[in-house]
Every structure is written in C-alpha cells, then in structure tokens.
Amino acid sequence: MTYTLAILGCGVMGQALLSAIYNAPKAADETAAAFYPSKIITCNHDEPSAQQVTDLVETFDESPNGIKVESTYGHNVSAVEEASVVLLGTKPFLAEEVLNGVKSVIGGKLLISLAAGWTIDQLSQYTSTVCRVMTNTPAKYGYGCAVVSYSADVSKEQKPLVNELISQVGKYVELPEKNMDAATALVGSGPAFVLLMLESLMESGLKLGIPLQESKECAMKVLEGTVKMVEKSGAHPSVLKHQVCTPGGTTIAGLCVMEEKGVKSGIINGVEEAARVASQLGQKKK
C-alpha cells in the first residue's frame, strides 16, 4: 500500500508533524512500512511559506522510509484530490475557509485535524472519517505528546495508521473527545507553562549571582532530572516533593513562599482558563 498525505497549513505544528513523520526510523517490516506515505504534499497560502517548508526539508537527510515531499501554495484542491489522508494544520480561525475550499474533494478521505476547538461533529460536515489530534511544539524533536480522538466511522484499519504517524511526535494518548479541550490546555499550551517555570528558575539563579548560561543549564537539568525521577520511581510528585524537604530547611521555606504567592493555584487556574478558551474556538462553526 502506498498513499499520499496532504498537509493543509504547514506552519509550526504542521512542520513539527512533517519533521517527525519524514525522519521516522525505518519501518521494521512491510506492515509497518505501509503506514507511512510515499509522498507528502504541503499546502500553504503564499510562496514565502512554501519556501520555508522547502528550506526545512533541505536540512533533512534522506527519509528512512523513502518519503518524498512536495511543497506548494495555492493548490489545496489538487493536493487533496491526490491524497488519501489529509492533515489539517491551519490555525483554528482559518480552518473553515480552508475546509470549504476543498469541500468538493475531501469526502471519503481520512482527516486528521490539529485545529483546536473544532469538534468531530463540525469536521464531519466535510468527511465522515475524522481524527482530532492535540499535540505540542516539542513534537518537532520527537519529545511531544499527542492526544487523539476518533469519529465513529474511522475503521480499525485506519486507527493503526494514525497511531503510527502520530506516535512519531512522542507519546500517543487516546482519549474521548470530551477531554480534548482540557488536552488542548494541558498538552498544547503546556510547554509555554513549563517554559515560564524554566525562565523563572533561570532568572532566580541570575538574581542570586549565578551567570546566565550556567543558570540556564542548571535549571534545564533540574526539570529534566525531576521528570525522569517521577517517571522512573512511579511515585506521586507530592511524595517526591516532601522527600526533598527537611524540618526547618531551605526547600520547605521556599515552598511556603510559593504557596503564599499562589503558584500552584495560579498554574491550575491558568490551565483551566486555557481550556475555557479552547472550548470557544469552534463555537461559531455549526
């Protein structure tokens, strides 16, 4: 089996998926190889955007799975006509215009949508086989997370294909669609929240006299090592947090100040607000 994948809107997230799929390790056997497209057509709205994709692909080595890439602009209809699988990578406010432009040719195609807030019901107006995906920018480096929901019409043969493609970004998690707005906040916006924590740790070191580069390196390693500790130990973060604290010590003193400043509630409320906004993104599209 060979097929073409069309990416409608190959910006930050589209390029992250393109990079992950194109550079995926060579498939172990013919069954796995069939999940990868022989060709990817990227579709953008203007020549500079298309050239950006071309420049990106030129930095890659040859695809381990023999995937070829064609970067285009203004040719959405012909790209979708050729494709069996369509990945919608446009910003949510552009999705309606883009989908209406290919409405006559997208029926019967498998649609993988990255458009936050667009529900399966809304997307099913264009094709019945729909997969909603929320991933994040670390996907570009293979360290992302992707939450996936399927329409009822997606077949048992199509799900493994989506699983294989999306797993290249990092962690693949299948959840009911009712969780997608929360996933948009936690997974999609999550890197920005973590980067705020990283920035805060860096700047605290700088304020206390540690040079910026060394402060950055230490803060990055603290985050990386802590995540690994949670992963390897299997313990709840609160248990590990209290293991660091000693009576009258530095850690509990710092934690008490952070609690007074509302750090934990601020993070929780921030994620909740991001989820609320995500729930509104598709409300105007009936």
Swiss-Prot record:
Enzyme kind, highest EC tier: oxidoreductase
Keyword set, alphabetical order: Amino-acid biosynthesis, Isopeptide bond, NADP, Oxidoreductase, Phosphoprotein, Proline biosynthesis, Ubl conjugation
The keyword Transferase belongs to this UniProt entry's keyword annotation: no
Pathway: Amino-acid biosynthesis; L-proline biosynthesis; L-proline from L-glutamate 5-semialdehyde: step 1/1
GO terms for cellular component: cytoplasm; cytosol
Biological process (GO), any one: proline biosynthetic process
Record cross-link Glycyl lysine isopeptide (Lys-Gly) (interchain with G-Cter in ubiquitin), residues: 171
An example Gene Ontology molecular-function term: identical protein binding
EC number assigned by the record: 1.5.1.2
Phosphothreonine sites (modified residues): 246
Catalytic activity annotation: L-proline + NADP(+) = (S)-1-pyrroline-5-carboxylate + NADPH + 2 H(+); L-proline + NAD(+) = (S)-1-pyrroline-5-carboxylate + NADH + 2 H(+)
Coiled-coil residue windows: none
Modified residues (Phosphoserine): 279
UniProt family annotation: Belongs to the pyrroline-5-carboxylate reductase family.
Main function: Catalyzes the reduction of 1-pyrroline-5-carboxylate (PCA) to L-proline, the final step in proline biosynthesis.
Cross-referenced PANTHER family: PYRROLINE-5-CARBOXYLATE REDUCTASE, PYRROLINE-5-CARBOXYLATE REDUCTASE 3
Anything else known: Present with 43500 molecules/cell in log phase SD medium.
Assembly information from the UniProt record: Homotetramer.
Name of the protein this chain belongs to: Pyrroline-5-carboxylate reductase
Originating species: Saccharomyces cerevisiae (strain ATCC 204508 / S288c) (Baker's yeast)
